Amino acid sequence: NVLDRLGYPTRSAELAGIAGYLHDIGNVVSRDHHGQSSALMAMSILSRMGMEPAEVALIMAAVGNHEEEYGHPVNEISAAVILADKSDVHRTRVRKKDIPTMDIHDRVSYAAERSFLDVDAEKRVITLTLTIDTGICPVMEYFEIFLTRMTMCRRAASVLECEFKLEINGACLL
C-alpha cells in the first residue's frame, strides 16, 4: 500500500506485500534474531515456488532487516515493510485483557485505540496517527518502547524520499 501510493512499480509493491506476509515467520524458530530466520525460511519457500533469485534476494533483504535491533531500510521494499511493521500498534494485538497484569508492551498496545499510516504522495509525507487512551498508558510509555521503532520509520521514509511524522492524540510529535 505504501509503495502503491508513492507511485512505485506494481511489482515492487507486490514484493513488499510478500515480504510483509513472511517477515515474522522466523518466530516459529525463535523470537531472537527472527528477522534472519525469517529471511532464510522465505528464501527456501520462495525458491521452491520458482521465484526469480533477484526477487528472492529483495524479499530476503527486506525480511532480514525489519527488526530495530539490527535492521536498516536497504531498499524501497524493506522501507515499506519497516513502516508497516513498526506502525502496527493496536489493542486488538493484545491477548491478555487484564490491565494490571500487562507488561509495558501490552499496556501500550492496549492503549492504542486507533492507528493509521497515512501516505501523502504529493507532499512526500508519511504520517503515523495514533489515538492513545492516556488513562491506560501515558504517552511517555509509548516512547519508552517505540522510540527506536519511530527512528527506524524515519529512516525508512527517507529511503522513499519522504518525511516521517508522528501524531499522537492530535499533537504532532515528530
Kindly give the residue locations of the regions a language model identified:
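Amphipathic alpha-helices of TPR/Sel1-like and other helical repeat/solenoid scaffolds
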Residues: 1-2
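Divalent metal-dependent catalytic cores for phosphoryl transfer on phosphate-bearing substrates
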Residues: 6-119
